[in-house]
Swiss-Prot record:
Residues 1-68 are annotated as: Domain I. Has three domains with a flexible linker between the domains II and III and assumes an 'L' shape. Domain III is highly mobile and contacts RuvB. It comes from Prochlorococcus marinus (strain MIT 9313). The lineage of its organism: Bacteria, Bacillati, Cyanobacteriota, Cyanophyceae, Synechococcales. Belongs to the RuvA family. This is Holliday junction branch migration complex subunit RuvA. Transmembrane segments: none annotated. GO terms for cellular component: cytoplasm; Holliday junction helicase complex; Holliday junction resolvase complex. Residues 69-147 are annotated as: Domain II. SMART domains: HhH1 (SM00278). Residues 148-158 are annotated as: Flexible linker. The gene is ruvA.
């Protein structure tokens, strides 16, 4: 079983909707399917790459799926463990969303977001949410790479990483669960939080951690009402 490959990109290929690269490793060329967004990233800069690999073995041969990050490969494996979700659908989900965004969508049951991926219907989206919600909620709590800033849930210009960590610690100390905290911060960052005057709040400034805390607490109290 191949775990990862390091080599030079010889060429890009496309067969219908499937895209990938031929990676030359120690004199052997491996044909690896990757998400289109990663293919465009590989068009620029260095020519040597490391891809984490998932290998699918069939009677008529094997297929390799490559990912620049291990956690994305692991997410792919989690997705294909769900009944009715094959490698192509899993890749489509990871093309539509970055890993952290996909975790958020599944945990929150955001069926509309999941259905934006090619080939994903409402029933499949519901199955993903039901079967993976608890598992991925635990995964997001454990994985230090699942930062709200790193996965694009909030912008680094909205809140410094150190301030974000302080905010999460403070809310956790008040008894809120990690998932509740992440949803609250996301709501405040997107401008979806409602202020005391029943009007949408403006996003607090990057340096005003207290304002972020107040807005998050208001959102959490409204959700609990």
């Amino acid at each position: 079983m191949i775990g990862w490959l390091q080599g030079q990109k010889v060429e890009a290929w496309q067969q219908g909707t499937r895209q990938g690269v031929v990676l030359a490793c120690a004199g052997v060329g491996y044909e690896v399917q990757i998400a289109p967004r990663h293919l465009s990233e590989m068009e620029h800069g260095q020519n040597t790459f490391i891809l984490w690999i998932h290998q699918v073995q069939r009677d008529d041969g094997s297929s390799l799926f490559g990912f620049p990050e291990r956690r994305e490969r692991d997410m792919f494996r989690t997705l294909i463990g769900v009944s009715g979700v094959g490698p192509q659908m899993a890749l489509a989900l990871l093309e539509e969303c970055q890993t952290g965004e996909l975790v958020e969508a599944i945990v929150q049951g955001d069926l509309r977001k999941l259905c934006q991926a090619q080939g994903v219907g409402k029933r499949t989206a519901e199955r993903l949410a039901v079967e993976l919600r608890t598992k991925l909620a635990e995964f997001s709590c454990r994985d230090p790479g699942m930062s709200l800033v790193d996965n694009g849930v909030i912008d680094s210009h909205q809140l410094k990483d150190s301030s974000l960590h302080e905010l999460q610690i403070t809310l956790g100390g008040l008894g809120y669960e990690d998932l509740e905290i992440r949803r609250a911060i996301r709501a405040v960052a997107s401008g979806a939080a409602i202020g005391a005057s029943d009007m949408p709040e403006s996003v607090p400034s990057i340096d005003d951690t207290d304002a972020w805390l107040r807005a998050s607490l208001r959102w959490l109290s409204q959700e609990a009402a």
